Structure formats: C-alpha cells, structure tokens
Amino acid sequence: YETIKMVVGKNYIVTFHLSHIRYVNKIVPKILQRGSQYSPLHVMHMLVSEIVEGYIPIISKIENRLDEIEEFDFFKSGSNILYEALELRGDLFKLRRGLRLMREVIHRSLVSRRVEMTDNDRKYFHDIYDDLVQQTEIIEANRELASDIRENFMTYNSLKSNNIMMTLTVISTIFLPLTFIVGLYGMNFKTMPELEWQYGYFLI
C-alpha cells in the first residue's frame, strides 16, 4: 500500500510520495499532451479517479476469494482457511481506511468555500465521491462475510468438540460396568461362591 499526498493551488498541483506511483505515471502523458486544458482540480480528479479504479480489481479479487472460502468444507480445509479469511479481512480494513481518507478529502473540497469549482469540476467530484461510497459499501459487505466465515468456523469446531465428547461419554458408559466387574473380581477375597458355580465363568 502506497501513500500519496497532494497540495492543490489555483494554478498548480503538487504530489508527495516516497516511491514511483503508477497512478501518477499514468496521467502524466495525458497532462503533457493537453497542457493547460486541465485545471489543477481536474488533474486532482483524474488522479483520484485512477486510484479508485485501481481499488476495484483488488476488492473484486478479495470478494471472489471469500465467496470460494464460504463454500469450502471446513472438515477438509482445516484452520488454514480461517487464517486466510482473517487475513483478507485485514486487507479489506486497509482498503477501507484508504477509501475513507479519499472520501474526506473529496467531501471537504466540495463543501469548502475556499475551493473554487466550476460546475463541471463539482460534477466530476460528486461522481468520484459516489464511486468511493459504493466501493466502501462493497468492502463493508465483504468484511461482514469474512466475520460470518469466522463465526461459522467457530460453530463448526464447537459442534465437532461436542460430538467428540458425546462419543467419549458413550464409550465410558459401555466400559464402566466392565471396569467395575474386573475390579470386583480382581480382589483377593477367599470366598466367591459364584466362581464355584458351573456357569459362573459365562456370567462374569
């Protein structure tokens, strides 16, 4: 995850980032081609739009993977699937944080009186804001799905443990009388009349 900061003035836009960011590199040729036709706000919109579009395939990939995990058989898959679901949930949290920051920037730009916008600029920023809201809602839905997968896994493990305990209880119930008989006749009593009986062996 890369971080980019922007300062937008009346006749300029400055970006700050620690490494080359492909979204910036992607729009530079367009700006150089048309020159002054793009206002700083238009350039800002282009950059944010590219970033949001870059989020879409990432979110879609995570969504598809969570759908696959939801269909898995926990008995065969084991805890590795749970760890993967939790890891994907963490990725969604980071994506949501990035989208939230961009939403705040766009919202402040729209409501600020110090930002002079044309009607077209305002329309562009409203569109990108709606896209950010939509992607945030998709992320929230997938985070809930990841949480449901975790809950289902916990429920599965609980049922599995209960079944094991039930099986052990049945086995203990079967062997308890046998243990009692073995313990009783393993004692060194001098007189045990039933042992002298001709059917005593079969009875015991």
What do these predicted ranges mean?
Residues 1-31:
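Divalent-cation
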Residues 11, 51, 61-185:
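Membrane-associated alpha-helical segments
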Residues 21-43, 66-76:
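A short, charged helix-loop
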Residues 34-51, 55, 118-122, 128:
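Long, non-coiled-coil amphipathic alpha-helical linker/lever segments
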Residues 36, 117, 157, 195-197:
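Residue-level signature of the cytosolic catalytic core of signaling kinases
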Residues 187-195:
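Short helix-loop junctions at transmembrane helix boundaries
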Residues 196-204:
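Hydrophobic alpha-helical transmembrane segments
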